[in-house]
């Protein structure tokens, strides 16, 4: 069993609220205040979950520099009240940063799902990479 500290539990909640505010801000026609608040909560929660040092080492790796610059640049653009452009930059940066994680996540969802259509879809999205 993996032990989770209280700070990590707070980080999971903060990240969840950040994702909620980002989605709610997009639902309300890219409300810049909700998007900015969601971005700040998401980044704060991520740093609470994995720690500041690991967060900085994740974002500032040499091969992830382009994704990091687009993601953090999008956050700054949203904070400057250009929400549509900022969210486009953030989305591109997010997919660039977490590109290696998606096959693992789809593989897990495919193996955890008992619904035949969804299982086949997630197995197809998984590609060649696997968890084992």
From Swiss-Prot:
Belongs to the GOT1 family. The chain crosses the membrane at residues 17-37, 40-60, 69-89, 101-121. The lineage of its organism: Eukaryota, Metazoa, Chordata, Craniata, Vertebrata. It is found in: Golgi apparatus membrane. It holds the Pfam family Got1. May be involved in fusion of ER-derived transport vesicles with the Golgi complex. Residues 1-16, 61-68, 122-132 are cytoplasmic. GO terms for biological process: endoplasmic reticulum to Golgi vesicle-mediated transport; protein transport; retrograde transport, endosome to Golgi. It comes from the Eukaryota. This is Vesicle transport protein GOT1A. It is a multi-pass membrane protein. Residues 38-39, 90-100 are lumenal. PANTHER family: CGI-141-RELATED/LIPASE CONTAINING PROTEIN, VESICLE TRANSPORT PROTEIN GOT1A. Keywords: Golgi apparatus, Membrane, Protein transport, Transmembrane, Transmembrane helix, Transport. One of its GO terms (cellular component) is Golgi membrane. InterPro entries: Got1, Vesicle_transpt_Got1/SFT2. It comes from Bos taurus (Bovine). The keyword Phosphoprotein does not apply. Its main location: Golgi.
């Amino acid at each position: 069993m993996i032990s989770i500290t209280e700070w990590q539990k707070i980080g999971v909640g903060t990240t969840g609220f950040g994702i909620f505010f980002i989605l709610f801000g997009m639902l309300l026609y890219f409300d810049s205040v909700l998007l900015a608040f969601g971005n700040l909560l998401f980044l704060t929660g991520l740093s609470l979950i994995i720690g500041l040092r690991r967060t900085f080492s994740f974002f500032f790796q040499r091969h992830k520099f382009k994704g990091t610059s687009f993601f953090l640049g999008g956050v700054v653009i949203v904070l400057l009240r250009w929400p549509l452009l900022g969210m486009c930059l953030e989305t591109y940066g997010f997919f660039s940063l977490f590109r290696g994680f998606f096959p693992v996540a789809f593989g897990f969802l495919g193996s955890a799902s008992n619904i035949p259509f969804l299982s086949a879809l997630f197995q197809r999205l998984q590609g060649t990479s696997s968890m084992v």
